[in-house]
Amino acid sequence: KNSGLESGLMIVQYVAGASLAELHGHAMPRSAFSTSTSAGQEDHVSMGATACWNLLVATERLSEVLACELFVACEALEFEQLQPAAHVRSLKQRVRVISPPLDGDRSTSKELKKIANELWQGGWLARIEAECGRLPR
């Protein structure tokens, strides 16, 4: 709202960019790093456990990126007089319980973390579909 005095959503963009950069790092296939072991008697180590760990961390980073996108989308809806679809309205209401609309610069780190956690746990989809009907798959 106050260009030049407030940063708006700039920091949210930085957070999303940092999480996305880390997500790219976790997308590298672990099988590319197989190594011989047991004095050369074993020529393959699957790195399956490492790949699973990277998948878990990657889903956490993805939830952070999506939380930033969702946060920005909810802010954008504050400036439009349009009525979004029922599922979007329900999702926005859930976000607004965690994060009220911006009325100036403030730290949103705790809010973004809570939104990311809700997305990562996956409970919102079931509750929104129970309220508004099943989304097409």
Which residues fall in each region the model found?
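C-terminal auxiliary extensions adjacent to catalytic cores
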Residues: 1-137
